[in-house]
Design a protein with these regions (language model features):
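Short amphipathic alpha-helical segments
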Residues: 15-22, 74, 78-82
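Non-catalytic substrate-recognition/targeting regions of SAM-dependent transferases
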Residues: 47-54, 58-60, 76-147, 155
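A short, charged
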Residues: 17, 21, 25-32, 91-110, ...
Length: 194
């Protein structure tokens, strides 16, 4: 288990302004490298925990919905402030914020989080990744609903799939399978139990 999560090495209040600044940095970086504003992708990881100096927080964007997941008690406690800051940073780019942390928080923290919308409520859950459209089940699916961090690996598979047979074990949404088919695989088998 993780004993300490460091949000800042400066003495500063962890408040709305802090969250807004951190989320702006994360969003600006994704814009600069072409992830956040992309005509063939409307799905990306906005916050990747420690990678964005926000340990214990994951925020994935699926079209107009942000799915927020807390992995620490502190993130859970600040979820509403984080959601407000996220709304300000993203503006009209997101209409919904879904909080999904029932299974990710430490059981010893005596927290009883409930999944649910913190903003909006639309279940328009079609997300686009390199032109492919996926149904994302953030309500009941694993993690935030889709393994966003595997996008480049799926794209890489597409380049190697031509005339090959592909076995996609633990396929979940079948993302790798669709890329393999689009890449010209002669046969694709997808297996999952969830």
């Amino acid at each position: 288990s993780i004993a300490v999560r460091v949000l800042s090495f400066r003495q500063e209040p962890i408040n709305h302004d802090f969250w807004k600044r951190k989320l702006e940095i994360a969003y600006d970086m994704r814009c600069a490298i072409g992830i956040a504003i992309n005509p063939v992708n409307d799905t990306y990881r906005l916050v990747h925990g420690e990678g964005d100096n926000l340990p214990g927080l994951v925020i994935d964007i699926y079209a107009k919905t942000a799915v927020m997941q807390a992995h620490s008690a502190g993130m859970h406690v600040d979820r509403m402030v984080i959601a407000e800051a996220l709304s300000e940073v993203m503006g009209d780019k997101i209409e919904n914020i879904y909080y999904k942390s029932e299974t990710t928080l430490p059981f010893k923290a005596d927290l009883f989080p409930e999944n649910g919308f913190l903003k909006g409520g639309s279940n328009d859950n079609i997300a686009q990744e390199y032109g492919l459209k996926f149904h994302v089940d953030w309500l009941k699916g694993q993690k935030t609903g889709f393994f966003v961090d595997q996008r480049e690996n799926r794209s890489l598979l597409e380049r190697y799939a031509k005339d090959r047979s592909v076995l996609n074990m633990f396929c979940y949404t079948g993302g790798f399978s669709f890329y393999a088919m689009r890449g010209g695989a002669k046969l694709v088998h997808s297996v999952d139990s969830s």
